[in-house]
Amino acid sequence: MDLIQQLTVEHQDYALKLATLAEVIDGIDANGRGNYFIATLDELLVPFTTELADHAHREEEFLFPRLLERAPDSPVAVMLAEHQVILEQSAQFGQWYNVWRDGDDDAYRKWADPALDLRGTFSTHMQKENLILFPLARRVLTDQEIRKLSDVGN
């Protein structure tokens, strides 16, 4: 599986996790704190913090520079700006979720709102990458370049 395929698969996994995140927040809004919700959020914390940062890093370090070389007018600058917003939302979720989890009910909106914002921002961002950026990469990069990116990006 090459780097672009791997990133696309990760996007599909994130889309499912984002839906789960929104469902859990809806559940907490309706029912309050509960062990099921906390267990589910605990499972989502690493994917939406550490793993998400790693995903963005692989795009920024391996794919985006090659795209800028070959297609300087590509939407890479937009993608980079969106990465900043997404990673900030991710950080807010990670920081305040743990405070709330440890018992501070006032921290709920401080993590839930950024998490819901993350869902919207990241969902549209992934669509741009899947529908515009990745097909562009396949057009302007050779198969050999994509294989090389895959070797260093994994």
Residue map of PLM features:
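Small-residue-biased structural context
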Residues: 1-154
